[in-house]
Amino acid sequence: TGAVPDAKKIDTSADAACTSKSPNLMTEDWAVKDGKLANAYVYIKSGTLADGSKIGDWTFETPSTPATLDQNGCHYKPHVLGVMVNQPITITNSDPTTHNIHFTPKNNPDWNQSQPNGAASMTHKLAVAEVLVPVKCNQHPWMKSYVGVTKHPFFAVTGEDGSFTLKGVPPGKYTVVAWHEGGAN
């Protein structure tokens, strides 16, 4: 409860390409519409299935289809992304300027790459579960994103209406956590 912080206009004047493409770029920390919170990462943290087994004991196939993180309008899209351990993440630069993709995890190796405009997409994988991995652009300090990494497919990111769906969850008792960059889980 309480007042939602107002989005603030981002000063992109340090890069004319950013100012030209996104003259009214706003912060995305608190994406709230009609009291509904977007960009919260929701996942099963732990649980026991109806047969008594633990969700952490199960093995799930890693998707071969990559998730996508795009640098477009001098901000990351999506702002929050969920993947499974070792699922490829394709990173593209749709802007007319150079970006720097910098994953700053706690449990995975640091990954820091420059991506000029017009460059080919890059692919990155995170080998260890981690909630959440911050991603930034060293050249544009306002650019940030977060990647949630789990060993299972039971995660979602809340939409603009605050809704989410955890698909295919087997019957059992679970601890479900919602993470948001603005505070408590």
Where are these regions (language model features)?
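Extracytoplasmic copper-binding redox domains, predominantly the cupredoxin/blue-copper superfamily
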Residues: G2-N185
